[in-house]
Amino acid sequence: MFISISAGIVTFLLTLVGIPAFIQFYRKAQITGQQMHEDVKQHQAKAGTPTMGGLIFLIAAVVVSFLVALFSKQLTNNVGMILFILVLYGLVGFLDDFLKVFRKINEGLNPKQKLALQLLGGVIFYLFYERGGDMLSIFGYQVHLGIFYIVFALFWLVGFSNAVNLTDGIDGLASISVVISLSAYGVIAYVQGQMDILLVILAMIGGLLGFFVFNHKPAKVFMGDVGSLALGGMLAAISMALHQEWTLLIIGIVYVFETTSVMMQVSYFKLTGGKRIFRMTPVHHHFELGGLSGKGNPWSEWKVDFFFWGVGLLASLLTLAILYLR
């Protein structure tokens, strides 16, 4: 446990030092920062803010986790595959960000390219991950999926990778939401005695807390797709490694809600010929524009943040209660 906590502290400090250096490099190189294409007026002031900051906490967490796991003899298959997902999905996000920032391609990777790379990572994860069978745990009941587990694994990894990406829309929202989710999985890993997984979890929590120092409103840096896609994939991989896949639907309720709001909005818009359910999606923008109802006073980013963090915290506590207070 001490080793895992130490890994988190080291990652926190590395990120705390690395982000200012990254921002300084960004400015000196006169790199065009984040482009704003949203209809939220208060976001226009963020144009030009350095992005791709997720690269710093991602490298710090992966390197520290690998080295500490190696020297403490905890470099298990679980650790290897979680780090693999972090690296591969991080690379997908990096390529997407690179095209947007350096090649001035607003779309970055097109949806088909991004999906293909994410699916490739998922297939490799499934082929090399020794999870001890193709059983899916649902509220304590084991369901044998056989070959269909790969379909679930791909859906889980790609779905939550993109869900966290959608959540990363206002200052600090995604970083602390993921800290809350990872903390819940840290408890589960500890109770199960899986200290190898706990090591990776605490290392990433340290990195995210260090990043948040510069990402809270007003953000000095954004994580970019390199950070958000990797974090979503990590959460999905951890839920599978712990054989508690179903828990991510509750622990990750914020990401589920964000994604569902987009799907509902698009479907309703097409069915009704232009009508909307929400003012704007992902749904955190709806609250920004008009509160819970969408017709009231606009919420500040801090208010939206605390609302979603509160929902995520309650959902995580509920999940732990379901698991351990039965």
UniProtKB/Swiss-Prot annotation:
InterPro entries: Glycosyl_transferase_4, PNAcMuramoyl-5peptid_Trfase, PNAcMuramoyl-5peptid_Trfase_CS. It is found in: Cell membrane. Catalyzes the initial step of the lipid cycle reactions in the biosynthesis of the cell wall peptidoglycan: transfers peptidoglycan precursor phospho-MurNAc-pentapeptide from UDP-MurNAc-pentapeptide onto the lipid carrier undecaprenyl phosphate, yielding undecaprenyl-pyrophosphoryl-MurNAc-pentapeptide, known as lipid I. Its cofactor is Mg(2+). It is a multi-pass membrane protein. It comes from the Bacteria. It catalyses: UDP-N-acetyl-alpha-D-muramoyl-L-alanyl-gamma-D-glutamyl-L-lysyl-D-alanyl-D-alanine + di-trans,octa-cis-undecaprenyl phosphate = Mur2Ac(oyl-L-Ala-gamma-D-Glu-L-Lys-D-Ala-D-Ala)-di-trans,octa-cis-undecaprenyl diphosphate + UMP. CDD domains: GT_MraY. One of its GO terms (molecular function) is phospho-N-acetylmuramoyl-pentapeptide-transferase activity. Coiled coil: none annotated. The chain crosses the membrane at residues 3-23, 51-71, 79-99, 115-135, 138-158, 169-189, 195-215, 221-243, 304-324. GO terms for biological process: cell division; cell wall organization; peptidoglycan biosynthetic process; regulation of cell shape. HAMAP family: MraY. This is Phospho-N-acetylmuramoyl-pentapeptide-transferase. Keywords: Cell cycle, Cell division, Cell membrane, Cell shape, Cell wall biogenesis/degradation, Magnesium, Membrane, Metal-binding, Peptidoglycan synthesis, Transferase, Transmembrane, Transmembrane helix. One of its GO terms (cellular component) is plasma membrane.
